[in-house]
């Protein structure tokens, strides 16, 4: 089935506190992930919260990559949504690896076609 896009949603657990709380590290990781997947970057916006946590988005021509971190729990939620022929798992795998996730639960949603079919991807 052809779709307009693929949306990978990952729950990352057991990540390093310092990495999850480092806005520069998170931003570089997301920019690198987008480029590794072959995406064209349009905008980048990240915010550091007090006392901890980072949220951000990389807008790509093909859609977006987002993150919300909770360093105090060793947890990050990430979304990688791509349209066209880009594979969002390339970016999602790279991000999980860079954050050192000990546990990862992922689902993939085909977007733009009905009905919605949730595909459970993988758990580390």
Swiss-Prot record:
Pathway: Amine and polyamine biosynthesis; S-adenosylmethioninamine biosynthesis; S-adenosylmethioninamine from S-adenosyl-L-methionine: step 1/1
Cofactor, free-text remark: Binds 1 pyruvoyl group covalently per subunit.
EC numbers: 4.1.1.50
Residues bearing the modification Pyruvic acid (Ser): 63
Cofactor dependency: pyruvate
Positions of the record's site feature: Cleavage (non-hydrolytic): 62-63
Family affiliation: Belongs to the prokaryotic AdoMetDC family. Type 1 subfamily.
Protein name: S-adenosylmethionine decarboxylase proenzyme
Taxon lineage: Bacteria, Bacillati, Bacillota, Bacilli, Bacillales
């Amino acid at each position: 089935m052809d779709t307009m896009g693929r949306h990978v949603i990952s729950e990352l657990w057991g990540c390093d506190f310092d990495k999850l709380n480092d806005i520069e590290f998170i931003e570089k990781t997301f920019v690198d992930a987008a480029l590794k997947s072959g995406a064209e970057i349009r905008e980048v916006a990240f915010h550091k919260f007090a006392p901890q946590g980072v949220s951000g988005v990389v807008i790509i021509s093909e859609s977006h990559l987002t993150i919300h971190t909770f360093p105090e729990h060793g947890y990050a939620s990430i979304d990688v949504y791509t349209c066209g022929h880009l594979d969002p798992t390339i970016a999602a795998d790279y991000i999980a690896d860079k954050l050192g996730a000990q546990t990862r639960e992922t689902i993939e949603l085909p977007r733009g076609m009905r009905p919605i079919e949730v595909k459970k991807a993988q758990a580390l």
